[in-house]
Protein backbone atom coordinates (compact mmCIF):
# COMPACT_ATOMS: atom_id res chain seq x y z
CA UNK A 1 0.00 0.00 0.00
CA UNK A 2 1.00 3.64 -0.36
CA UNK A 3 0.68 6.39 2.23
CA UNK A 4 -0.10 9.82 0.79
CA UNK A 5 1.74 12.69 2.50
CA UNK A 6 -0.26 15.90 1.89
CA UNK A 7 1.62 19.20 1.75
CA UNK A 8 0.10 22.62 2.43
CA UNK A 9 3.08 24.88 1.74
CA UNK A 10 3.15 27.90 4.06
CA UNK A 11 4.05 30.67 4.72
CA UNK A 12 5.55 30.99 1.22
CA UNK A 13 4.17 29.51 -2.01
CA UNK A 14 0.78 30.82 -0.86
CA UNK A 15 -0.28 33.07 -3.73
CA UNK A 16 -3.55 31.20 -4.29
CA UNK A 17 -4.47 31.73 -0.63
CA UNK A 18 -3.59 35.44 -0.44
CA UNK A 19 -5.18 36.14 -3.83
CA UNK A 20 -8.41 34.67 -2.46
CA UNK A 21 -8.00 36.20 1.00
CA UNK A 22 -5.72 39.26 0.63
CA UNK A 23 -6.13 40.14 4.30
CA UNK A 24 -3.96 37.10 5.16
CA UNK A 25 -0.86 38.73 3.63
CA UNK A 26 1.26 41.61 4.88
CA UNK A 27 0.28 43.53 1.73
CA UNK A 28 -3.52 43.34 1.55
CA UNK A 29 -5.00 44.55 -1.69
CA UNK A 30 -6.06 43.22 -5.05
CA UNK A 31 -3.91 40.35 -6.35
CA UNK A 32 -3.52 39.23 -9.93
CA UNK A 33 -2.60 35.58 -10.38
CA UNK A 34 -0.77 35.07 -13.66
CA UNK A 35 0.72 31.56 -13.91
CA UNK A 36 4.14 31.58 -15.51
CA UNK A 37 5.03 35.14 -14.53
CA UNK A 38 8.28 35.63 -12.67
CA UNK A 39 7.44 36.18 -9.02
CA UNK A 40 10.77 35.72 -7.23
CA UNK A 41 14.52 36.13 -7.64
CA UNK A 42 17.22 33.99 -6.05
CA UNK A 43 20.29 36.11 -5.21
CA UNK A 44 23.13 34.43 -3.35
CA UNK A 45 22.84 30.98 -4.90
CA UNK A 46 19.27 30.31 -3.85
CA UNK A 47 19.71 30.46 -0.06
CA UNK A 48 17.70 33.69 0.21
CA UNK A 49 14.68 34.73 -1.80
CA UNK A 50 13.43 38.12 -2.88
CA UNK A 51 9.79 38.30 -3.85
CA UNK A 52 8.60 40.40 -6.75
CA UNK A 53 5.03 39.54 -5.74
CA UNK A 54 4.03 38.91 -2.14
CA UNK A 55 3.01 35.25 -2.03
CA UNK A 56 3.41 34.82 1.73
CA UNK A 57 1.07 34.59 4.68
CA UNK A 58 1.61 37.18 7.41
CA UNK A 59 2.91 35.57 10.65
CA UNK A 60 1.70 38.56 12.69
CA UNK A 61 -1.94 38.18 11.67
CA UNK A 62 -4.10 36.04 13.96
CA UNK A 63 -6.56 35.46 11.11
CA UNK A 64 -3.82 33.44 9.38
CA UNK A 65 -3.79 30.87 12.18
CA UNK A 66 -7.59 30.69 12.25
CA UNK A 67 -7.52 30.05 8.50
CA UNK A 68 -4.82 27.38 8.79
CA UNK A 69 -6.67 25.66 11.62
CA UNK A 70 -9.64 25.18 9.29
CA UNK A 71 -7.41 24.03 6.42
CA UNK A 72 -5.48 21.49 8.49
CA UNK A 73 -8.69 20.23 10.09
CA UNK A 74 -9.95 19.24 6.63
CA UNK A 75 -6.58 17.86 5.53
CA UNK A 76 -6.31 15.70 8.65
CA UNK A 77 -9.77 14.26 7.99
CA UNK A 78 -9.00 13.50 4.34
CA UNK A 79 -5.58 11.85 4.77
CA UNK A 80 -5.04 9.02 7.27
CA UNK A 81 -1.21 9.24 7.17
CA UNK A 82 0.31 10.33 10.48
CA UNK A 83 2.29 13.22 8.97
CA UNK A 84 1.23 16.50 7.37
CA UNK A 85 3.82 18.50 5.41
CA UNK A 86 3.71 22.26 6.02
CA UNK A 87 6.33 23.27 3.44
CA UNK A 88 8.23 26.19 4.96
CA UNK A 89 10.58 26.55 1.99
CA UNK A 90 11.49 29.40 -0.35
CA UNK A 91 9.79 32.12 1.67
CA UNK A 92 10.41 35.62 0.31
CA UNK A 93 10.38 37.73 3.45
CA UNK A 94 11.19 41.15 2.00
CA UNK A 95 7.54 42.18 2.35
CA UNK A 96 7.66 41.28 6.05
CA UNK A 97 10.59 43.63 6.64
CA UNK A 98 8.48 46.71 5.91
CA UNK A 99 5.34 45.63 7.77
CA UNK A 100 4.36 47.35 11.03
CA UNK A 101 2.54 44.21 12.23
CA UNK A 102 5.76 42.20 11.90
CA UNK A 103 7.76 44.87 13.73
CA UNK A 104 5.22 44.82 16.56
CA UNK A 105 5.32 41.01 16.70
CA UNK A 106 9.12 41.01 16.89
CA UNK A 107 9.03 43.47 19.78
CA UNK A 108 6.27 41.60 21.62
CA UNK A 109 7.83 38.13 21.22
CA UNK A 110 11.47 39.30 21.46
CA UNK A 111 12.27 37.98 17.98
CA UNK A 112 15.68 39.15 16.82
CA UNK A 113 15.39 38.62 13.05
CA UNK A 114 13.16 37.28 10.29
CA UNK A 115 14.50 33.73 10.77
CA UNK A 116 13.01 33.85 14.25
CA UNK A 117 9.78 35.34 12.88
CA UNK A 118 9.44 32.39 10.52
CA UNK A 119 10.33 29.98 13.32
CA UNK A 120 7.56 31.56 15.44
CA UNK A 121 5.15 30.89 12.58
CA UNK A 122 6.34 27.29 12.11
CA UNK A 123 6.00 26.51 15.81
CA UNK A 124 2.44 27.81 15.84
CA UNK A 125 1.61 25.74 12.76
CA UNK A 126 3.07 22.67 14.47
CA UNK A 127 0.72 23.19 17.42
CA UNK A 128 -2.22 23.34 15.02
CA UNK A 129 -1.14 20.15 13.22
CA UNK A 130 -0.43 18.33 16.49
CA UNK A 131 -3.90 19.30 17.73
CA UNK A 132 -5.33 17.27 14.82
CA UNK A 133 -3.50 14.16 16.02
CA UNK A 134 -0.81 14.49 13.33
CA UNK A 135 2.95 14.99 13.22
CA UNK A 136 4.42 17.89 11.25
CA UNK A 137 7.18 17.66 8.67
CA UNK A 138 8.67 20.54 6.68
CA UNK A 139 11.49 21.40 4.31
CA UNK A 140 14.88 22.10 5.91
CA UNK A 141 14.30 25.88 6.04
CA UNK A 142 12.25 25.20 9.17
CA UNK A 143 15.58 24.73 10.96
CA UNK A 144 16.28 28.45 10.60
CA UNK A 145 15.54 30.43 13.73
CA UNK A 146 15.00 27.31 15.83
CA UNK A 147 13.25 24.04 15.00
CA UNK A 148 9.75 23.33 16.28
CA UNK A 149 9.86 20.83 19.19
CA UNK A 150 8.44 17.73 17.50
CA UNK A 151 8.91 18.53 13.82
CA UNK A 152 10.41 16.18 11.26
CA UNK A 153 12.63 17.63 8.54
CA UNK A 154 12.71 16.90 4.82
CA UNK A 155 16.22 17.89 3.72
CA UNK A 156 16.38 19.19 0.13
CA UNK A 157 19.27 21.69 0.13
CA UNK A 158 21.84 18.94 0.45
CA UNK A 159 22.23 16.51 3.35
CA UNK A 160 23.45 18.97 6.01
CA UNK A 161 19.99 20.07 7.15
CA UNK A 162 18.94 16.48 7.66
CA UNK A 163 22.12 15.68 9.55
CA UNK A 164 21.64 18.72 11.80
CA UNK A 165 18.05 17.74 12.52
CA UNK A 166 18.91 14.10 13.24
CA UNK A 167 21.71 15.11 15.61
CA UNK A 168 19.09 17.17 17.47
CA UNK A 169 16.89 14.08 17.81
CA UNK A 170 14.39 14.86 15.04
CA UNK A 171 13.10 12.49 12.38
CA UNK A 172 14.40 13.13 8.85
CA UNK A 173 13.59 12.32 5.23
CA UNK A 174 16.53 12.86 2.87
CA UNK A 175 15.61 14.52 -0.42
CA UNK A 176 18.76 16.35 -1.64
CA UNK A 177 18.70 18.12 -5.00
CA UNK A 178 22.07 16.64 -5.97
CA UNK A 179 20.70 13.09 -6.05
CA UNK A 180 16.91 12.91 -6.23
CA UNK A 181 15.52 15.96 -8.04
CA UNK A 182 14.26 14.11 -11.08
CA UNK A 183 12.98 17.23 -12.81
CA UNK A 184 16.63 17.85 -13.76
CA UNK A 185 18.00 16.84 -17.18
CA UNK A 186 19.22 13.25 -17.39
CA UNK A 187 21.88 13.84 -20.01
CA UNK A 188 23.35 16.40 -22.36
CA UNK A 189 21.40 19.61 -22.91
CA UNK A 190 21.59 19.13 -26.68
CA UNK A 191 19.11 16.26 -26.50
CA UNK A 192 17.19 16.64 -23.23
CA UNK A 193 14.14 18.78 -22.38
CA UNK A 194 15.70 22.04 -21.14
CA UNK A 195 16.08 22.52 -17.38
CA UNK A 196 18.68 24.48 -15.43
CA UNK A 197 20.59 21.49 -14.03
CA UNK A 198 21.57 17.88 -14.73
CA UNK A 199 21.17 14.68 -12.72
CA UNK A 200 22.30 11.49 -14.42
CA UNK A 201 21.04 8.04 -13.53
CA UNK A 202 24.39 6.91 -12.14
CA UNK A 203 24.49 9.89 -9.78
CA UNK A 204 21.00 9.06 -8.52
CA UNK A 205 22.08 5.45 -7.95
CA UNK A 206 25.00 6.71 -5.83
CA UNK A 207 22.62 8.38 -3.36
CA UNK A 208 23.31 7.30 0.23
CA UNK A 209 20.40 8.34 2.46
CA UNK A 210 22.06 7.15 5.70
CA UNK A 211 24.91 9.56 6.52
CA UNK A 212 27.62 8.56 8.94
CA UNK A 213 27.49 9.81 12.49
CA UNK A 214 23.72 10.00 13.00
CA UNK A 215 21.15 7.69 14.56
CA UNK A 216 19.92 5.63 11.61
CA UNK A 217 16.54 5.15 13.26
CA UNK A 218 15.87 8.86 12.82
CA UNK A 219 16.41 8.69 9.04
CA UNK A 220 12.91 7.62 8.03
CA UNK A 221 13.70 7.35 4.32
CA UNK A 222 14.26 9.32 1.15
CA UNK A 223 12.15 11.08 -1.43
CA UNK A 224 12.58 11.89 -5.12
CA UNK A 225 10.89 15.03 -6.42
CA UNK A 226 9.45 15.63 -9.87
CA UNK A 227 8.43 19.29 -9.93
CA UNK A 228 6.36 19.97 -13.02
CA UNK A 229 6.76 23.68 -13.81
CA UNK A 230 8.64 22.60 -16.93
CA UNK A 231 6.96 19.22 -17.47
CA UNK A 232 4.11 19.74 -19.88
CA UNK A 233 2.26 16.43 -20.24
CA UNK A 234 2.05 12.89 -18.89
CA UNK A 235 4.46 11.42 -21.45
CA UNK A 236 7.01 14.05 -20.45
CA UNK A 237 6.45 13.15 -16.79
CA UNK A 238 7.03 9.47 -17.55
CA UNK A 239 10.25 10.36 -19.39
CA UNK A 240 11.55 12.29 -16.39
CA UNK A 241 10.53 9.59 -13.91
CA UNK A 242 11.99 6.48 -15.55
CA UNK A 243 14.54 5.04 -15.04
CA UNK A 244 15.68 7.34 -12.23
CA UNK A 245 12.79 6.25 -10.00
CA UNK A 246 14.15 2.69 -10.33
CA UNK A 247 17.48 3.90 -8.95
CA UNK A 248 15.81 5.69 -6.05
CA UNK A 249 13.75 2.61 -5.21
CA UNK A 250 16.75 0.29 -5.21
CA UNK A 251 18.80 2.71 -3.11
CA UNK A 252 16.05 2.98 -0.50
CA UNK A 253 15.29 -0.73 -0.15
CA UNK A 254 18.87 -2.05 -0.46
CA UNK A 255 21.72 -1.79 2.04
CA UNK A 256 24.76 0.03 0.69
CA UNK A 257 26.91 -3.11 0.47
CA UNK A 258 24.34 -4.79 -1.78
CA UNK A 259 24.25 -2.00 -4.37
CA UNK A 260 26.28 -2.34 -7.54
CA UNK A 261 25.99 -0.12 -10.62
CA UNK A 262 27.14 -2.82 -13.03
CA UNK A 263 24.47 -5.17 -11.69
CA UNK A 264 21.82 -2.45 -11.69
CA UNK A 265 22.15 -1.65 -15.42
CA UNK A 266 20.87 -5.07 -16.65
CA UNK A 267 17.93 -4.79 -14.28
CA UNK A 268 17.09 -1.39 -15.77
CA UNK A 269 17.31 -2.84 -19.27
CA UNK A 270 14.88 -5.60 -18.29
CA UNK A 271 12.47 -2.92 -17.07
CA UNK A 272 12.90 -1.07 -20.38
CA UNK A 273 11.53 -4.18 -22.12
CA UNK A 274 8.47 -4.14 -19.87
CA UNK A 275 7.97 -0.41 -20.42
CA UNK A 276 8.22 -0.85 -24.18
CA UNK A 277 5.52 -3.52 -24.03
CA UNK A 278 3.30 -1.29 -21.88
CA UNK A 279 4.06 1.82 -23.99
CA UNK A 280 5.45 3.66 -20.98
CA UNK A 281 7.87 6.40 -21.97
CA UNK A 282 11.33 6.43 -20.40
CA UNK A 283 14.65 8.18 -20.92
CA UNK A 284 17.39 6.18 -22.71
CA UNK A 285 19.88 8.83 -21.57
CA UNK A 286 22.20 6.36 -19.83
CA UNK A 287 23.33 5.22 -23.28
CA UNK A 288 24.17 8.73 -24.53
CA UNK A 289 27.72 10.10 -24.29
CA UNK A 290 28.84 12.39 -21.49
CA UNK A 291 30.41 15.41 -23.17
CA UNK A 292 33.03 17.66 -21.55
CA UNK A 293 34.28 20.63 -23.57
CA UNK A 294 37.41 22.67 -22.83
CA UNK A 295 39.82 24.88 -24.73
CA UNK A 296 43.52 24.83 -25.48
CA UNK A 297 45.69 27.79 -26.50
CA UNK A 298 42.60 30.06 -26.43
CA UNK A 299 41.29 28.90 -29.82
CA UNK A 300 41.33 25.09 -29.97
CA UNK A 301 38.27 23.19 -28.75
CA UNK A 302 38.93 19.91 -26.90
CA UNK A 303 36.12 17.38 -26.45
CA UNK A 304 36.37 14.59 -23.86
CA UNK A 305 33.76 11.83 -23.99
CA UNK A 306 32.63 9.17 -21.55
CA UNK A 307 29.66 6.88 -20.92
CA UNK A 308 27.67 5.87 -17.87
CA UNK A 309 27.17 2.31 -19.10
CA UNK A 310 30.19 0.06 -19.56
CA UNK A 311 30.89 -1.67 -22.86
CA UNK A 312 29.68 1.11 -25.16
CA UNK A 313 31.67 2.49 -28.08
CA UNK A 314 31.22 6.13 -29.05
CA UNK A 315 31.36 6.93 -32.78
CA UNK A 316 31.65 10.48 -34.07
CA UNK A 317 31.80 12.76 -37.09
CA UNK A 318 32.71 16.40 -37.72
CA UNK A 319 31.51 16.66 -41.34
CA UNK A 320 27.76 16.87 -40.65
CA UNK A 321 27.19 13.23 -41.66
CA UNK A 322 25.43 10.90 -39.23
CA UNK A 323 27.89 8.42 -37.68
CA UNK A 324 27.25 4.73 -37.19
CA UNK A 325 29.45 1.86 -36.05
CA UNK A 326 31.62 2.17 -39.19
CA UNK A 327 32.70 5.69 -38.24
CA UNK A 328 35.74 6.48 -36.08
CA UNK A 329 35.50 5.25 -32.50
CA UNK A 330 36.40 7.59 -29.67
CA UNK A 331 39.59 6.64 -27.80
CA UNK A 332 41.27 9.85 -26.63
CA UNK A 333 40.15 13.50 -26.29
CA UNK A 334 39.26 15.08 -29.63
CA UNK A 335 40.59 18.33 -31.02
CA UNK A 336 37.76 19.84 -33.05
CA UNK A 337 38.91 20.73 -36.60
CA UNK A 338 38.48 24.42 -37.37
CA UNK A 339 36.43 23.67 -40.48
CA UNK A 340 33.98 21.39 -38.64
CA UNK A 341 30.28 21.68 -39.37
CA UNK A 342 29.19 20.08 -36.09
CA UNK A 343 30.10 17.26 -33.74
CA UNK A 344 27.75 14.29 -34.12
CA UNK A 345 27.85 11.32 -31.75
CA UNK A 346 26.22 7.96 -31.25
CA UNK A 347 26.94 4.93 -29.04
CA UNK A 348 26.95 1.27 -30.03
CA UNK A 349 27.30 -2.05 -28.27
CA UNK A 350 28.75 -4.30 -30.92
CA UNK A 351 26.62 -3.75 -34.00
CA UNK A 352 23.59 -2.46 -32.10
CA UNK A 353 22.92 1.25 -31.75
CA UNK A 354 22.25 2.06 -28.10
CA UNK A 355 22.27 5.83 -27.78
CA UNK A 356 20.52 8.54 -29.73
CA UNK A 357 22.13 10.56 -32.49
CA UNK A 358 23.48 13.69 -30.81
CA UNK A 359 24.36 16.93 -32.58
CA UNK A 360 26.49 19.65 -30.99
CA UNK A 361 26.83 22.69 -33.24
CA UNK A 362 30.08 24.60 -33.56
CA UNK A 363 28.43 27.59 -31.93
CA UNK A 364 27.49 25.45 -28.94
CA UNK A 365 30.97 23.90 -28.73
CA UNK A 366 32.54 27.37 -28.70
CA UNK A 367 30.10 28.51 -26.03
CA UNK A 368 30.91 25.53 -23.80
CA UNK A 369 34.63 26.04 -24.34
CA UNK A 370 34.38 29.73 -23.49
CA UNK A 371 35.56 30.85 -26.93
CA UNK A 372 33.91 33.89 -28.51
Question: Which residues make up each language-model segment?
Answer:
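Generic recognition of stable, solvent-exposed alpha-helical segments in well-folded globular domains
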Residues: 52, 59, 63-71, 116-124, ...
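Short, solvent-exposed loop/turn and secondary-structure capping segments
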Residues: 9, 15-20, 96-98, 164-165, ...
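Structured core elements
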Residues: 3-7, 56-58, 83-87, 137-138, ...
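An acidic- and aromatic-residue-enriched active-site/binding cleft used to recognize and process polar
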Residues: 2, 7-13, 89-91, 141-144, ...
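Domain-scale activation on soluble regions of proteins
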Residues: 3, 15, 58, 192, ...
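Substrate-binding cleft of carbohydrate-active enzyme catalytic domains
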Residues: 1-134
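Short, compositionally stereotyped local motifs that mark structural "simplifiers"
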Residues: 255, 259-372
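Flexible, acidic glycine-rich loops studded with aromatic residues
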Residues: 135-151, 157-301
Amino acid sequence: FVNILPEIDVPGHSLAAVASYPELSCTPGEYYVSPGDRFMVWPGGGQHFYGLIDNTLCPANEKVYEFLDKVFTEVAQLFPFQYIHMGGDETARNFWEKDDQIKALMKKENLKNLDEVQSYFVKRVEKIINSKGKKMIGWDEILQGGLAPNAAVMSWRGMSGGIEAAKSGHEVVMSPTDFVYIDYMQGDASIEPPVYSTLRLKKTYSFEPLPAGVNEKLIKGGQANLWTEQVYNMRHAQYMTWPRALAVAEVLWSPKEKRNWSGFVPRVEKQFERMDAAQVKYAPSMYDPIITVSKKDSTKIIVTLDTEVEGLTIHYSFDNSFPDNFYPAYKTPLTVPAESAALKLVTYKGNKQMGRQMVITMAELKKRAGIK
